[in-house]
Amino acid sequence: MSTENALLTILVDRINNDTLVLPTLPEVVIKVRQAADNPDVNLMQMSDVIAHDPALSARMIKVANSAIMGRAVKVSNLHQAVTRIGLRQIKNIATAIAMEQLFVSNNELIKGYMGKAWHKTLHVASHSISLMEFYLKRNTHTSLNRDAITLASLVYNIGVLPILTEAERHPEVFANPSFLAHAIQRLSGKIGGSIMKAWEFPDVFVEVAQHWADVNHRTAEVSYIDFIR
């Protein structure tokens, strides 16, 4: 058995034995997502949830003042930011901010992979959302929606993270470009599905993370995975 295959075997064993370290969402993001799914939550209550994390609060204000919101008047506090962004978008923005923080590394090789993975995620998200907008204009009765494709495009490639994290923890063993490329190709889908299940995301996101790169995976009807590929 080659060294590369031996390393892959180690990773596969860790996946099968549930000993591979999976990334976790920050507690505040989990609370934001739960609050956003609560039909009784109002803007003030959402502001109170976000306020427990100063860094997230600052990022929300920055997003609210960004060009994408298209407003000339700047907001100066969290409640104004949440009001401008709206409850519908808060959940995905909080998740995106948390996701960006996961793609960091102190190892130069792994840092490069992390950066490429995150930029690829942003690229795919941009195209997927644009495709969905085009699709929705011509399919007004579909159950697919903008919020779900936004989230799906942010998490579709999450499976690369544990592989890169493992390489960072044991660079002398795993931090090899050839091995990493092979491991990501073979294992990231299965790992991605496991992460979505661990995060208790709906099945549509499990499908996207697990099968987006599997050309043999087909769905009976148009689904979010078709916009990611």
Predicted regions and their residues:
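Conserved alpha-helical "signature site"
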Residues: 1-155, 162-169, 175-183, 187-229
